[in-house]
């Protein structure tokens, strides 16, 4: 299976980042290591059908079975019981990661309503990028009829970048549409 983003990384992105940042070794060049997708269920966590629908939606979107995250201990103030489902998470690496990135950049982000670009302030101090999508219907795999309620999720792109600037340049080289400040 062809992976255009992986080939683009090797042929275009690595030489550009070496020239921009003056890396001495090819292994110093930052790369994307994994993508984590999380959805918290909130009050709907007690509803088993909502949990099953969320698992199925995330599985369809990512191509990988998600893990249900459970509460570690009871907290009465939040009406939370131990081992109660809180949400779902999935970690994508290698082939599935590049496949998801390709669809995210080329199909999903252009379909987001009133999209002006991703916020460049979503980077942490280590060059990882976090952002959220408000609606699962922007993914072409999800049909409108199968959705009972619109729910968003968080996407974390973990990189080996050491700084925010390196992470920003890496993702911008991949084609992420960031807002102009």
Swiss-Prot record:
InterPro entries per record: Ribosomal_uL5, Ribosomal_uL5_bac-type, Ribosomal_uL5_C, Ribosomal_uL5_CS, Ribosomal_uL5_dom_sf, Ribosomal_uL5_N
GO molecular-function term, one example from the UniProt record: rRNA binding
Single GO cellular component term: ribonucleoprotein complex
SUPFAM superfamilies reported for this sequence: RL5-like
UniProt entry tagged with the keyword Ribonucleoprotein: yes
BP GO terms, sorted: translation
Entry superkingdom: Eukaryota
Subcellular location as annotated: Plastid, Chloroplast
Sorted UniProt keywords: Chloroplast, Plastid, Ribonucleoprotein, Ribosomal protein, RNA-binding, rRNA-binding
Subunit: Part of the 50S ribosomal subunit; contacts the 5S rRNA.
Protein task: Binds 5S rRNA, forms part of the central protuberance of the 50S subunit.
Protein family per UniProt: Belongs to the universal ribosomal protein uL5 family.
Protein name: Large ribosomal subunit protein uL5c
